[in-house]
Amino acid sequence: KGGHGGKKKFCVSTQHYSFAVNAFVDLIKQYGQDEYDFSLRETQTYEIIEDVARMRSEIGILFLNDFNEVVMDKILKSHDLEFHLLFIAKPHVFISRNHPLAGREIITNEELEQYPYLSYEQGEHNSFYFSEEIFSPFERKKNIRVRDRATLFNLLIGLNGYTVCSGVI
């Protein structure tokens, strides 16, 4: 978007992904001039859809899988939006380097069962279909939901928790 006096404006709404932040940094380095007004909104899934539909953001970054694809496609179409695939992700378990399971090549769901599972809460639209995590439909004994990435990582370290995500950092 062109801003007042030639200042470039641009906004991206995204789920909580480091790769999106890194891409945003690259974007600013490539297109940032003397003046710009760029925004990166790490937010809940439904808010991302609303942001793009209402033109608050030019781009939204969402995770789709076999479980949520049909529902999310309907929601996107109802907002007159399109989904474009960036990449296909394989699940990775994120744990701290001091976690008892650290250093293992493969970790099973049974081995993770005793540890807290950390995920992002989705507010009033808190449904499995809006989840940011790859294996969200699985039932877990210990669940902690947070709103921001820093809190998730601090709890992951402090409680020997884990999350499952794309592995793209």
Protein language model regions, located:
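Central regulatory/effector-binding core of bacterial HTH transcription factors
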Residues: 7-71
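Flexible hinge/capping segments at coil-to-helix
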Residues: 4, 75-117
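General small-molecule cofactor/ligand-binding pocket signal
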Residues: 37-41, 84, 143-145
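Hydrophobic hinge/microswitch elements
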Residues: 53-56, 122-169
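Alpha-helical "hinge/linker" immediately C-terminal to small N-terminal DNA-binding modules
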Residues: 1-7
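Short hydrophobic/charged patches on amphipathic alpha-helices used for structural packing
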Residues: 49-53, 83, 109, 152-153
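Beta->alpha turn/N-cap motifs
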Residues: 44-45, 61-68, 96-97, 148, ...
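Secondary-structure junction motif
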Residues: 20-23, 69, 109-138
